[in-house]
Amino acid sequence: MSTVNVQIGLHELLNGSNAQIQLSVPQLVEKVLMRNEGKLTSTGAVSASTGKYTGRSPKDKFIVKEASVADKIAWGAVNQPISEEHFNKLYTKVLEYLKEKEELFVFKGFAGADRNYRLPIQVINEYAWHNLFVHQLFIRPTEEELTTHESGFTIVSAPNFKADPAVDGTNSEAFIMVSFEKRIVLIGGTEYAGEMKKSIFSIMNFLLPEQDILSMHCSANVGEEGDVALFFGLSGTGKTTLSADPNRKLIGDDEHGWSDNGVFNIEGGCYAKCVNLSHEKEPQIFDAITFGSVLENVIINDQTRIADYNDTTLTENTRAAYPMHAIDNIVLPSVAGHPNTIIFLTADASGVLPPISKLSKEQAMYHFLSGYTSKLAGTERGVTSPQATFSTCFGSPFLPLDASRYAEMLGEKIEKHDAKVFLVNTGWTGGEYGVGKRMNLGYTRAMIQAALNGELAKTETAKHDIFGLEVPLHVPGVPDEVLMPEQTWADKAAYKAKAIELANEFKANFKKFDSVSEDIINLGGPIA
């Protein structure tokens, strides 16, 4: 199937009598309720269930192996190849399936808040609530922009279309396929809305580096003086909590690009976890869940329609999707200058990493590539005790290119813009998980504040004898003994043994990076 034929098929779909294009939020909410796709909550949000797929399905994600990208993609478990033949046949079947639907919902918008680098996108949805989701998550066009909008990538989403693995070359009934040549994302068999968001992020992680822009899985905020901070971290490290600062404006909570102009948000909304959400803990998120917002897999009281954020009957991965303008303390458009401070967050359950360390460029690249944190019991099936986990660049499921490409770009930008990088451990202190305790949030906030306002640039440091990290000896508002992890352990020999054990896990993980320069290994990693 040629690209021309793909466009003809899309044109027919978009011009069919069943295509509802660019409906407003109230219109989409009406459609969701009329079609029994969801319920209205007491705050005016739409609540929907995603069926058996309550999270991303990484084993069902494919990139079409096409001549123009075959030697660029880092093929493997994350980027699984599928043939053009399989894609073309499945794409044709999905289009025929959607043509028969009574209604289809189409959103046209953008990914990328910087107008110089934004990607025009369109999304064709079988479900009205999915279309409401993308309307809130991506960047919405003005009336004028809509008249000249030409899509650079199209998502075709048909959750009720099930693949046949024996015929379609998939691993299950679900599929998420990206064709870079045909500029199509094809999604079926799963109702989880996050697949649409993360597909566009994966695409931007391919397209932006080609323009010398670093794409990043991080949150970002900016201070009153225009100083920009990035927060990288895997689930459970405190990224959302620590980047939501009343004294700083939010640029974005999850996906960003770093160009020669500065930092920009890739999205136009937020996709926040809402397990155990309360107004006391996360007032910004709690208050954003109003009319037009989408709740995913949250249990709602049948009579009062009040959301119970503590009920994880369906999944712990309950989510809320809302536009950026639902939050008060934001920058719009979501662009800012070059980062002054970069924070890598890790929740170290072994309790051996310092609560804050200053990183050299090589150490920053090493820890960026490592993407370390601890998986805690309850976050995944089968995890009963904490396990060291490494997610390359703090976002390995979304990286189509070789990881070293992103790390090299980060190193270049750190050097060019003199960004200060810190590794912050929000995990355990005084012993490992089960013995020690979780790092005091007030102390972590004080350390981050000191990093942001430049106080740590002039403070005295000591080199950690196992990890080689520069550890500040004094931080305002934090007891000195907390800063050196060994001092918080009663059994110093046990500390050393545990630290060496973690250092060896870092080294073992890093062996997979065979294209990384020796400097990063020798100057960036553990020294014992």
UniProtKB/Swiss-Prot annotation:
Keyword set, alphabetical order: ATP-binding, Cytoplasm, Decarboxylase, Gluconeogenesis, Lyase, Manganese, Metal-binding, Nucleotide-binding
Known EC number: 4.1.1.49
Family: Belongs to the phosphoenolpyruvate carboxykinase (ATP) family.
Binding sites annotated in the UniProt record for substrate: R56, Y192, K198, R319
Pathway info: Carbohydrate biosynthesis; gluconeogenesis
Gene Ontology biological process terms in this record: gluconeogenesis
Organism: Bacillus cereus (strain B4264)
Cofactor remark from the record: Binds 1 Mn(2+) ion per subunit.
Residues that coordinate or bind Mn(2+): K198, H217, D254
Function, in words: Involved in the gluconeogenesis. Catalyzes the conversion of oxaloacetate (OAA) to phosphoenolpyruvate (PEP) through direct phosphoryl transfer between the nucleoside triphosphate and OAA.
One Gene Ontology term of the molecular function aspect: phosphoenolpyruvate carboxykinase (ATP) activity
GO cellular component: cytosol
Descriptive protein name: Phosphoenolpyruvate carboxykinase (ATP)
Compartment(s): Cytoplasm
